[in-house]
Amino acid sequence: MVSLPKLSAKIIIRLIYIYQIGISPILGHHCRFSITCSQYGINSIRNFGILKGCWKTCIRILKCHPFNKNDNTQ
């Protein structure tokens, strides 16, 4: 039986895939980072679990704007 956190992580990752395939091409590719924020989100959720992975993804998305002074290789 799959645990609730693992099931939730799979659902979130599927939603990110839907965004990557269905929505991102319409909006255009504007991510300033070398690994896109959506791919970073998938990797973070897989590596850190759903809570920490989603938190790290939210922080990353908040940094994804042209006025961020950090480099773009994160």
UniProtKB/Swiss-Prot annotation:
Cellular location(s):
Cell inner membrane
Q: Name one GO cellular component term.
A: plasma membrane
> Disulphide bridges in this chain?
none
Report the superkingdom from the record. Answer: Bacteria
**Species annotation:** Blochmanniella floridana
Protein name, entry field: Putative membrane protein insertion efficiency factor
Q: What Pfam families does the entry give?
A: YidD
Is this entry keyworded Cell inner membrane? Answer: yes
